[in-house]
Regions:
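Conserved catalytic-core motifs of GNAT/GCN5-like acyltransferases
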Residues: 13, 126, 144-162
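Alpha-helical hinge/cap motifs
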Residues: 90, 99-101, 147
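Conserved GNAT acetyl-CoA-binding A-motif
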Residues: 117-126
Length: 172
């Protein structure tokens, strides 16, 4: 899957993306609401290899790099769920590029592409309820909040709430 927007290239990760991705995942602000800890020099290669491993949605999961002027500024992950024709989408972006619409532009493009080209019926996003930026992005691309689970994830030493956002192909 290779997509282009007005400003971005969206493609599977390549070997030479490791340092750009490390810039994203070594930032404590970025990882605050994620289910994993920040990357460090000891785990960066192992973590990055997991990103490289999934490069075809047909195999169940894909990790996509969002590239601006040859620099990876974001990561979009898509995986099939156990429900027929349903995928979950997740996204993480470099905090230095926030507020410029890159996340909206890339996630919206990927969502439209999935519905149009993969016969997807439903896309969901599961996020930490404190991650207001992520919730706003879901709403901006046309997702609706379908659930609020109370203290359902044990993450970084505390129970946290989560939101489930969803949209159907017919919502486009």
């Amino acid at each position: 899957m290779i997509l282009r927007t007005e400003r971005l290239l969206i493609r599977p990760f390549k070997e030479n993306d490791i340092n750009d991705l490390y810039d994203i995942y070594s930032d404590t602000k970025v990882c605050k609401y994620l289910l994993h800890d920040v990357w460090n020099e000891d785990n960066k290669l192992k973590e990055f290899q997991q990103k490289l491993k999934y490069n075809k949605l047909e195999e169940g999961k894909i990790n996509l790099a969002c590239v601006l002027d040859k620099k990876v500024i974001g990561d979009i992950s898509i995986c099939y769920t156990e429900m027929k024709e349903t995928v979950e989408i997740g996204y993480t972006f470099n905090s230095r590029y926030s507020g410029k619409g890159y996340a909206y532009e890339s996630v919206k493009t990927v969502v439209k592409y999935l519905f149009k080209n993969y016969g997807i019926h439903r896309i969901i996003a599961n996020l930490d309820s404190r991650n207001l930026s992520s919730a706003k992005l879901c709403e901006r691309i046309g997702m609706r909040k379908e659930a609020h689970f109370i203290k359902d994830y044990w993450n970084k030493g505390e129970w946290t709430d989560s939101y489930i956002y969803g949209m159907l192909a017919s919502d486009l």
